[in-house]
Amino acid sequence: MPVNIRIPTPLRKLTHDEEVVETSAENIGQAIADLEARYPGIQERLLDESGEVRRFVNVYVNEEDIRFLDNKDTAIKDGDEVSIIPAIAGG
């Protein structure tokens, strides 16, 4: 059973409208690299110039924010669900 990555609506144009993408990556960094290999351009939407997750992008593994875990080194395993959630500003 692979890891499922839930793709937010604004990024689905890069994943050919796929809402859920499967990966066999072992951590978040590898999962993002896997997404980039399959869907060029998605990584620049998720990572900043220093290679860290952009501050307005939230990534969760089984509903836990990776910023409170090991960031991109957060381990993932078969059956986990990764959610990418862009922050929304308003006013």
Model-identified regions with their sequence ranges:
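Ubiquitin-like/PB1-type beta-grasp interaction modules and other compact soluble beta-rich domains
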Residues: 1-90
